[in-house]
Amino acid sequence: MSSVGTALAKTPLQPFGTYCNQPRLIQAMEARGLDGMVITNPLNVYYLSGFNSIAHKSDEPRPYAVVISRHSPEQPIMVIADYYLSTLAALQGPITDIRPFRAVMMPMDLPPAAADIERFIDQPTAAQNWISGARENYRFDMKSALLGALSSVGLKTGRIGFDDLGFGLRLRLDGVDAADAYDAMMFARAVKTPAEMQLLQQATALNEAAIERSRADWTPGITWREMDRIYAGHVNDLGGFVRDPGGMVWGHPRGADSALVLSTSNDNTPIEAGTHVMFDCHGTTALYCWDGGKTWVVDDEPQGLAKQLDGATQRVAETMLAAMKPGARISELQALGRQTYRQCGVADGDQAIIFFHGLGLSHMDIETTTADGQ
């Protein structure tokens, strides 16, 4: 295993409150008048609890939820399908109030019984301090378990945010004003904790190593589709994960054609020597993203105008990095980048595409609408 892969393998799971920016989470609820939240989005659940569910597709209903009250945020509750009890026991996560419910693995042709929960309690799970409470709070459907959790934290009524508002509306909870909590969660996730920064640094290092290995594997005749698979293979070897259809690669330009072209596994044309490539690769480690990469002139070095633009782009990047301070606006940084291009003698800086990659549990850990409706 490489040094990057070894570092990832040795990275311990972090406790609750290390990934989660709790002060901003509470601030977001206060600003939006939320008494509490019911969180079901898998990335948000992971952010709050460290729990990463297994093998669910993105459009499937989630058999879990985190319930958190603004008035007692130190007492979150996890509502979860009974078959995940052993997963939680192995995680030894921070949420110790576990409310299981009878889920799809139990037979539909037999009547539900309180003893059904025992089918999912192995010896390590039985040793958990929270298991007696889980047994006591076992319910036969998710809504019943969720209602019990809401009652326990004083949220039988009030304004409750759901990061999946459709889920909240389908529950038809009496006395509850269901509100959208997507932006509240993104407000918290926007500012990373030190533990998150460490994960993002590791993810970026893994991406760089995978790109360098992929470049070294290029030979004449290799197609974009093959390069995509080569890159994904190196990511896997290094301990990362690439989602279907894979890491994106931008090929730009191709000869005299300056169009931005996304080349992925759907493109089976060869990568020709002399092609200017900008790798823009996506993937995750411990669910945290990397995004971006580096430029490459295939089997060559920048020449002529390309060499001038390469040097100017380095200056632009250095200038913008120095200006990236709290409060700086993306538009201001882009304008500064164009100004730097002009200072470097680039004739038409307005033709430059200056784009900023987002990093976090997603590539857009930002609000779409602020608390004041902007």
Region roles according to the model:
Residues 1-374:
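Active-site neighborhoods and metal-handling regions in enzymes and metal-associated proteins
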